[in-house]
Structures are given as C-alpha cells and as structure tokens.
Design a protein with these regions (language model features):
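Bacterial N-terminal signal peptides that target proteins for export
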Residues: 1-8
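Arg/Lys-rich, alpha-helical DNA-contact motif
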Residues: 13
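C-terminal motif of bacterial Sec signal peptides marking the signal peptidase cleavage site
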Residues: 16-19
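Cell-envelope/extracellular polymer assembly enzymes that use nucleotide-activated donors
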Residues: 21-275
Length: 275
C-alpha cells in the first residue's frame, strides 16, 4: 500500500471512530433552562411533560385492589401501595444533592411519608402448601390483562431522553465541576469518595427524623453543589438539547401520551367497582 493510500485509510478510520465515539450532533437551544423546584426537590426538564412514570391514574390502583381482594379471600391483610404525584420519577439528584433548604429539613434522604407499601412477608396461609403472596400477585396480574392493555411509558420519550443526555455528556465540563465540588466539601471538613457522595455519609442510618450530623453533612454537600453550580449547569445542558427534540417530535410524544391515558382509562370501572 502506498503512503498516500495509508494516509487516506487512517483518515477514514479516524473519522469513523470519531463518529462512533460522539454520535450525531444534536441541535441545541442555548436559551433553555432546567426548572429547579426547591419546594418539591425536583428538577423539571422540557421532556418531563411526556414522562408517564408514576402518572397512571387507574391501573396501579386496580392492580392493588385485585391483590387486596385475593389476600382477603385467604383471610390475610394486604396494605395497598398508594402512589403520590410524580412517584417513580427521577427527582433531580443525578448530579448530587443541590437543595439546601430541603437538606436542612430531611438530611440526605427524600421524604416519602405519603407513599405506603407493605413489603413484609404475609402470614402463613391456612394451606401450608400454598404461597399466598405468589398466588395473589399472579392472579391480580392475570386479571388486569383480561381487562385491557397495560399502560406503558412512551418509547419516544425514552429515546429522546437518552439522546439528549448523551449529547449533553460533556465529560470535560462534568469533571471540572466534580473536581470543584470535591474541593469545596473537602475544605468544609468532609471526605469525598465519589462525584456525589462523601465518606462520612456511609454510616448515617436512614430514619424518619434525620440527626444533626446527617443534616450537617447534607447541607454541606448541597451548598457546595450550589456554589459550584454543578446541577444547574449540567441540567441546563440537558434542557438545551431536550427542547429542540421536543419541538421536532411533538406529534409522536403527544400520540404516545394519549395512548397511555387511553389504556389507563380501561381500568377506571374496575377501580370504581372495587374500591
């Protein structure tokens, strides 16, 4: 192979590898910003309007009612899961704790007092050979399938969320912000052991009432996040890639959201008849 051919081949390989590494360049709207809802400790991005995680109105309740009915037939109590607004969503801690006011109230952990789910093992059945939990979960699932189609989340939403996050994956920016955050918490007496955690938090037990030490550690982490602007800058970057994607794919997003709601509506009558 001549020197020229070798040079051209190397250039071609370099181009292919470059494309594989970074993927297609997406449109970016520099004006887009993530919304930081401090009261609810949530970060809201443009695509979130189409995120169906935790937003079914009837299906989950119908499934839980079917389970409860089955347990009652076996003379056992079943504590139903009560879904709260937005349950199941990413609450905005991808880049660490950022909400100082929330950290002052709840420490390192999220407040989840409005969700109830009894995960304890049920009492033994009157029939020693029967696993009531397994039977009732399967029966409830089968009953739901007979009623209608299970509401699933939007495939378009998932794809666009992944595309935007990949496009926003500026590792140089993230590393710079991570390093600044680590220096900040270290200057305040903590020992960073990852990009979002400190060594001192490992021995803090999760409890309904956070200790003074837990609150101190959480506040330092959140304050450093705000001082450095880590969550703000990285979520803003995601929002800037999400906004044009939403505009270009709005019809598909709207249609899949309508389909989700249509499927969920099929379980309304079951809820009304059994609650």
């Amino acid at each position: 192979m001549s020197a020229l051919k070798k040079l051209l081949a190397a250039a071609l390989i370099s181009t292919v590898l470059s494309f594989c590494s970074f993927g297609p360049t997406l449109e970016k709207d520099e004006s887009a910003r993530a919304i930081f809802d401090a009261e609810n400790d949530q970060v809201i991005l443009p695509l979130d309007a189409y995120n169906t995680d935790g937003k079914d109105e009837y299906f989950t309740k119908a499934l839980e009612l079917a389970r409860k009915k089955c347990f009652a037939e076996h003379g056992q109590h079943y504590k139903m899961f009560v879904r709260t607004e937005g349950a199941g969503r990413n609450f905005g801690r991808t880049y660490g704790i950022w909400n100082v006011e929330y950290a002052q109230k709840y420490g390192l952990h999220k407040s989840d007092d409005s969700n109830t789910l009894d995960l304890s093992s049920p009492a033994p059945s009157s029939d020693p050979g029967k696993d009531v939990s397994t039977e009732c979960y399967q029966r409830a699932s089968d009953e739901m399938k007979q009623i209608g189609e299970i509401p699933f989340g939007s495939a378009t939403y998932r794809r666009l969320e992944t595309d935007a996050r990949n496009a926003a994956g500026d590792q140089q920016l993230k590393k710079s912000l991570d390093d600044e955050w680590k220096r900040c918490v270290k200057d305040k007496g903590l020992t960073p052991d990852s990009e979002v955690t400190v060594k001192e938090s490992k021995n803090i037990p999760q409890s309904a009432t956070p200790s003074e030490e837990e609150i101190r550690i959480a506040v330092i982490q959140a304050q450093c996040n705000q001082d450095v602007g880590r969550s703000q800058k990285l979520y803003d970057l995601e929002a800037q890639y999400q906004k044009p994607l939403v505009a270009k794919n709005q019809a598909a997003l709207e249609n899949e959201l309508k389909e989700f709601k249509r499927r969920d509506e099929q379980f309304k009558q079951y809820v009304l008849d059994n609650q």
